[in-house]
């Protein structure tokens, strides 16, 4: 039935139940078409929305079906403020609805029509979102007011439930493109599923080797800074802000007669509002306090636990309500929260003691956020009432830890909460919020839990929180620190890798914080070193860097105790292997402090005699150079000894080692170093490639120490386009790897260097290294150079554009705020420009650059993916003009020059898969996945990964495509290589079959009912074929997992 026909029916004078049934069927059909055929339905969208809105208020038994009041616009006469009010919100208007004059009490089934209309709107919002087909006007001036107006006019529970769910979908769509910090500890785009992990970040990836100072890890107890709710003048956020008072008031009214399921939907909507309008519920907390307290009272009344009769839905409602409290606590300013939270704390405490472990665990999560909201730095003054509330939260958390009858998950969560509370109440200001007695008792409890195998890991992480935020020596006592250190050291010998890593990370925090490190005595440090030395091994580099850093922090003032044969042997064992990044920086830091303490003689002797050229010459050379400079006269050798060695020896290995030592020495000595460029440049002509590269690296290191003396020579060589330009690019790279050291001295020559790099990098062999140098140079002064990328992208030379694209991609790994501020207005225009490059190689580079931007700068580009990803989806299509025939002997072969481009496009789509754009274009996305399965094996593999991910992200759409997937999977499994096929072709076919069987297994497990529902006949036949013909392979896959 068409929308117009439906509209005609609505004007009939008589109420015909059969007509209602037909309308219901039509609306259900429209919902299915919108969900399954979104592209084809775009032209019918306006009519579809109009029909849904009309039948949303279809109620033939009520005489007046006039237009509903608008959500915003003119003020109601009774309004005392600037917020538009809905007139029909009083309770009395709904208590005796059937007694109203316009209502007929005949058997009324029209609610089914209204429910289907609401579900249709839900499908429209979920499928199209805020996209090209559905603009903000339709969402916020048509759909939203109609839903809000219907909230309290609707009588049927099931229709109300659909209305609330539809509004929740709309609210989440409002947040598309905005990054929200959630209580789970992630930056999340609401409604997108995109998460950026807040792992411990060491902001030292670009730090110079010479000034490396490891940073303290972040703590989950530190919380996140609150951002004031934005007040946009226009747009979806503005529309939502205007509607917020009416929505909240309507939900509170609806709550009074709501069932558990409807209450749960209301709570979920309130949580979405709290996250989307970050801090925006501040003026409405008093209104929603009663509904929240109403749910918590089910615990206060002493209801039995889930195991002995409490309904699952009631428990789920409690969990959602506690999650709402967490979200509000995290997103709203403490000044507004205090009365609200203090009123709810008793109910939360009772929920913590609930026998349903899921309720108890979620209540503890709420306690964590409440604690953060009621402690410094968010609260500065400790009132008696506040202290009393915090002590109650402390008591309930502590009691759950010591309650042996509590579920393990609850006890572990309580330990975490206790750690947060103790960490947040340290220092002089924080100590006023928790008594000394309770603090001491809590610290003892953490040690006690550290000794228990089941709670050990949680205790380790809680202690780490305390260590990171300890800001006074008096916050912890010496015995506690020493006992904790001994226990943590013992865990380093355990086989549990997660426990070992967490224990080492906590030891790192204890050693790096001077307030906790001050409690160490000689015996503790000696025992700790003995636990750490076995970890100074290249067998597990993830444990190596923290171990080196811990010892480096303990050595100052304790060198005679700690610098011994065991430590020296361990250092000498790791320099035999190539090291880079943080591990190399940590090693050089340790070598540096050993030299500064005057204890480097034994280490120097061992490095020269026992390792020497047998180790990695770069690592050994940098270690010796560091020790030479910082050990001074105590190490038994001088720089001149290595200069003489370089001039005399003909052994390439010895030359490489001497060059590395001299380069590192010159770097650290700076302008006081007597070495000149002529020490290194003659070796550019060496017959040994290793020596040539070593001399280039050493020249760059020396140049970083004395830019004024070295840069003119390097720049002169580059401007001449010297045949040795590739080596000079290596030197420039090393020079720019010390940005803080060289920034000021490079600045006067930066423009010349920039231009020289672009010229030299035109050569194919120089392009990759040159682009990295251009990127590093741009990062020295982002405001000056990042805007220039746009200018060079218009250059007619494809080679120049290639360099600029690669250089820009290199810069994206920089996480500094100063760079992000420059990049924010430029990144999208730059990417759009790059993606429009017609040069095939450059276009592929642009795709990999967008991929890098999605991984590194998602917050900056997320609101603009609608501008970027449609072109990428276009690049996943096979382009016949890029396929050519090549004659090879008597045979003709087809060569697809677009294959790598398509592969890069699919990789980029995969990277953006869990963003709001992809999920709102899911039908189009699946069409490209289906096409990719028919493509080459590399692309097919990516499509299988995408399908696997969409099982979780878009289960309904994935299930809808099972038949289409099965057709393509069948073709792959039935493919038989020719009898004369070469080994490579046979292996390729086997790899394709295995990949299909793996994803088949995942789909089968995710949708076990698909074979029995009767809607997926092709999928059912396919699964029967797979089990019959590939049962053995499936069994093998099961055993693997």
Swiss-Prot record:
One of the protein's GO biological processes: SCF complex assembly
Intervals holding HEAT repeats: 138-176, 242-279, 339-376, 434-472, 479-516, 525-560, 598-637, 670-708, 710-744, 780-817, 822-867
Biased composition (Acidic residues): 65-103
InterPro entries per record: ARM-like, ARM-type_fold, CAND1/CAND2, TATA-bd_TIP120
Compartmental location: Nucleus
Biased composition (Basic and acidic residues): 9-24
Assembly and oligomerization: Interacts with candA-N. Interacts with unneddylated cullins culA and culD.
Protein name: Cullin-associated NEDD8-dissociated protein 1, C-terminal part
Organism: Emericella nidulans (strain FGSC A4 / ATCC 38163 / CBS 112.46 / NRRL 194 / M139)
């Amino acid at each position: 039935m068409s929308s117009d026909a439906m509209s005609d029916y609505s004007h009939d004078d008589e109420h015909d139940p059969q007509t209602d049934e037909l309308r219901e069927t039509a609306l259900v059909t429209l919902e299915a078409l919108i969900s399954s055929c979104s592209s084809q339905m775009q032209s019918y969208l306006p009519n579809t929305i109009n029909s849904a809105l009309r039948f949303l208020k279809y109620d033939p038994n009520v005489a007046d079906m006039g237009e509903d009041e608008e959500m915003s616009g003119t003020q109601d006469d009774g309004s005392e403020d600037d917020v538009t009010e809905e007139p029909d919100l009083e309770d009395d208007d709904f208590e005796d609805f059937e007694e109203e004059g316009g209502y007929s009490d005949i058997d009324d089934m029209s609610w089914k029509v209204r429910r289907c209309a609401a579900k249709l709107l839900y499908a429209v919002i979920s499928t199209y979102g805020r996209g090209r087909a559905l603009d903000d006007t339709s969402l916020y001036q048509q759909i939203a007011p109609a839903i809000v107006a219907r909230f309290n006019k609707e009588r049927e529970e099931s229709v109300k439930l659909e209305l609330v769910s539809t509004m929740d979908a709309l609210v989440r769509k409002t947040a598309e493109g905005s990054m929200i910090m959630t209580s789970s500890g992630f930056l999340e785009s609401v409604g997108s599923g995109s998460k950026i992990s807040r792992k411990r970040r060491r902001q030292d990836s670009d730090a110079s080797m010479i000034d490396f100072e490891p940073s303290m890890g972040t703590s989950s107890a530190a919380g996140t800074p609150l951002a004031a709710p934005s007040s946009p003048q226009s747009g979806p956020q503005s529309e939502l802000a205007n509607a917020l008072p009416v929505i909240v008031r309507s939900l509170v009214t609806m709550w009074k007669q709501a069932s558990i399921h409807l209450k749960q939907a209301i709570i979920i909507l309130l949580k979405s509002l709290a996250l989307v309008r970050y801090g925006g519920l501040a003026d409405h907390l008093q209104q929603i306090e009663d509904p929240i307290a109403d749910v918590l009272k089910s615990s206060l009344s002493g209801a039995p636990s889930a195991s002995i009769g409490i309904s699952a839905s009631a428990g789920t409602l409690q969990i959602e309500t506690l999650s709402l409290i967490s979200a509000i606590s995290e997103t709203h300013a403490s000044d507004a929260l205090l009365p609200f939270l203090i009123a709810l704390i008793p109910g939360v405490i009772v929920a913590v003691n609930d026998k349903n472990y899921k309720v108890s665990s979620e209540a503890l999560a709420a306690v964590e956020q409440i604690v953060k909201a009621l402690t410094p730095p968010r609260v500065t003054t400790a009132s008696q009432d506040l202290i009393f509330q915090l002590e109650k939260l402390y008591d309930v958390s502590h009691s759950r830890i010591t309650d042996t009858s509590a579920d393990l998950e609850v006890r572990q969560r309580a330990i975490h909460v206790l750690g947060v509370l103790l960490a947040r109440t340290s220092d002089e200001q924080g100590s006023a919020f928790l008594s000394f007695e309770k603090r001491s008792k809590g610290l003892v409890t953490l040690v006690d839990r550290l000794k228990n195998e089941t709670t050990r890991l949680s205790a380790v992480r809680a202690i780490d929180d305390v260590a990171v935020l300890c800001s006074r020596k008096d916050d912890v006592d010496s015995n506690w620190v020493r006992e904790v250190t001994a226990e943590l050291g013992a865990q380093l010998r355990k086989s549990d890798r997660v426990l070992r890593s967490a224990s080492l990370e906590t030891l790192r925090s204890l050693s790096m914080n001077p307030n906790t490190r001050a409690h160490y005595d000689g015996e503790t440090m000696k025992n700790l070193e003995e636990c750490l030395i076995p970890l100074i091994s290249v067998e597990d580099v993830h444990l190596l860097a923290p171990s080196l850093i811990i010892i480096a922090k303990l050595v100052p003032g304790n060198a005679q105790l700690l610098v011994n044969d065991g430590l020296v042997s361990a250092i000498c064992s790791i320099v035999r292997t190539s090291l880079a990044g943080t591990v190399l920086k940590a090693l050089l830091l340790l070598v540096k402090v050993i030299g500064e303490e005057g204890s480097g003689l034994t280490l120097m002797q061992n490095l020269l005699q026992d390792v020497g050229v047998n180790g990695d010459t770069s690592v050994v050379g940098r270690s010796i150079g560091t020790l030479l400079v910082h050990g001074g006269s105590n190490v038994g050798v001088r720089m001149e000894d290595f200069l003489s060695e370089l001039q005399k020896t003909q052994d390439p290995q010895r030359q490489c080692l001497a060059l590395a030592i001299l380069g590192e020495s010159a770097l650290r000595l700076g302008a006081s170093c007597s070495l000149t460029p002529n020490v290194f440049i003659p070796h550019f002509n060496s017959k040994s490639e290793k020596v040539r590269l070593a001399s280039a690296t050493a020249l760059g290191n020396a140049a970083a120490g004395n830019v004024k003396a070295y840069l003119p020579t390097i720049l002169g060589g580059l401007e001449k386009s010297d045949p040795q330009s590739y080596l000079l690019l290596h030197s420039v790279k090393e020079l720019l790897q010390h940005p803080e050291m060289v920034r000021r001295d490079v600045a006067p020559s930066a423009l010349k260097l920039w231009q020289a790099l672009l010229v030299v990098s035109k050569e194919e062999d120089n392009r990759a290294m040159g682009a990295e140098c251009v990127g590093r140079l741009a990062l020295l002064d982002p405001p000056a150079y990042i805007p220039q990328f746009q200018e060079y992208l218009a250059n007619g030379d494809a080679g120049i554009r290639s360099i600029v694209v690669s250089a820009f991609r290199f810069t994206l790994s920089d996480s500094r705020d100063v760079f992000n501020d420059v990049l924010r207005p430029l990144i999208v225009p730059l990417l759009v420009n790059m993606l429009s490059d017609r040069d095939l190689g450059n276009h592929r580079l642009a795709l990999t650059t967008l991929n890098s931007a999605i991984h590194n700068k998602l917050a900056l580009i997320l609101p603009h993916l609608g501008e970027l990803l449609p072109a990428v989806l276009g690049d996943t299509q096979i382009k016949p003009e890029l396929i050519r025939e090549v004659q090879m002997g008597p045979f003709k072969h087809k060569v697809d020059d677009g294959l790598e481009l398509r592969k890069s496009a699919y990789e980029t789509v995969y990277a953006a898969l869990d963003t709001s754009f992809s999920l709102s274009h899911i039908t189009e996305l699946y069409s490209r996945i289906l096409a990719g399965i028919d493509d080459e094996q590399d692309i097919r593999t990516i499509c299988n990964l995408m399908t696997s991910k969409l099982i979780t992200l878009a289960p309904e759409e994935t299930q809808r495509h099972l038949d289409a997937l099965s057709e393509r999977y069948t073709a792959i499994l039935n493919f038989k290589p020719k009898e004369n096929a070469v080994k490579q072709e046979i292996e390729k076919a086997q790899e394709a079959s295995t990949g299909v069987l793996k994803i088949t297994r995942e789909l089968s497990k995710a949708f076990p009912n698909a074979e029995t529902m009767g809607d997926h006949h092709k999928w059912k036949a396919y699964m029967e074929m797979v089990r019959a013909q590939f049962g053995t392979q499936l069994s093998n896959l099961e055993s693997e997992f």
